[in-house]
Amino acid sequence: MFNKKNILITGGTGSFGKTYTKVLLENYKPNKIIIYSRDELKQFEMASVFNAPCMRYFIGDVRDKERLSAAMRDVDFVIHAAAMKHVPIAEYNPMECIKTNIHGAQNVIDACFENGVKKCIALSTDKACNPVNLYGATKLASDKLFVAANNIAGNKQTRFGVTRYGNVVGSRGSVVPFFKKLISEGAKELPITDTRMTRFWISLEDGVKFVLSNFERMHGGEIFIPKIPSMKITDLAHALAPNLSHKIIGIRAGEKLHEIMISSDDSHLTYEFENYYAISPSIKFVDKDNDFSINALGEKGQKVKDGFSYSSDNNPLWASEKELLEIINHTEGF
């Protein structure tokens, strides 16, 4: 699907973008991979590692629609990974978060339309479901924008989808590198916000592969959610440092005890497939009549029961300490 195609990744110098680039280069023969991001140093460092002839690097901000549109010329597929995602920082700088996560999302949509992009997938987060913090609220708004974009496409062929998942093991700013840094510095204890806290976990590699597969299965308008394991934060801390004690510091601004990826309010829109769930659009598209119970590959899903929810504390899949360490070690080697 990606052979001889032009692919653009916003926020491409981040953990996801670099892994996505690695997977594309190892498994496909793209015509161009365009990395679109703000930080010239990160682009310089990434270019020293990913220097294949097909690589292109564009300095730009998703807030700048003109620059974004210029970078998207002749692009076939877009992955929108750029975001302001640090929860407490977003709480203290709300308008900056809104400019990047909401205005930036609309700029991506407009640039896709202007350049005839075939498909665009936006990365979302479990924090967008029943949000209690500004980051989650902006990502919910972003999700809504990308879903609704399919309805305003008119005679344009661009299709938009959303991929929503939980904490990415090893990604920049996540708890795993934070804990490992404390351990390497000789910490005597690890800070835990609440002993009851649970989270969804996915490796960078699995996250990338899930997004890749969604390009093939999407009609346009779906929110795709992978079936991934949960784990208690205390189990993670014990797995990384079994001999260290834990210090309870309390929940930070905007945090939840448990994350939700599908709320019961969306159960009537949700279909279960073998390895994932798909939330169909809540609005009826004017000129499209897709059957979202069957994906674009012809695979059939089943409607979930009314009142179904998918939360990190009611998840049937739980990662053991051994399994999580395997994910962490594999991610570092990847």
Curated annotation (Swiss-Prot):
Active site (UniProt): 127
Reactions catalysed, as given in the entry: UDP-N-acetyl-alpha-D-glucosamine = UDP-2-acetamido-2,6-dideoxy-beta-L-arabino-hex-4-ulose + H2O
Gene3D superfamilies per record: NAD(P)-binding Rossmann-like Domain
Keywords annotated in UniProt: Lyase, NADP, Nucleotide-binding
Molecular function terms, GO-annotated: lyase activity; nucleotide binding
UniProt: NADP(+) binding residues: 13-16, 37-42, 61-62, 81, 85, 123-124, 135, 139, 168-172
Keyword NADP among record annotations: yes
Described function: Catalyzes the first step in the biosynthesis of pseudaminic acid, a sialic-acid-like sugar that is used to modify flagellin. Has both C6 dehydratase and C5 epimerase activities that result in the production of both UDP-2-acetamido-2,6-dideoxy-beta-L-arabino-4-hexulose and UDP-2-acetamido-2,6-dideoxy-alpha-D-xylo-4-hexulose.
Family per similarity comment: Belongs to the polysaccharide synthase family.
Protein name: UDP-N-acetylglucosamine 4,6-dehydratase (inverting)
Source organism: Campylobacter jejuni subsp. jejuni serotype O:2 (strain ATCC 700819 / NCTC 11168)
Gene name for this UniProt entry: pseB
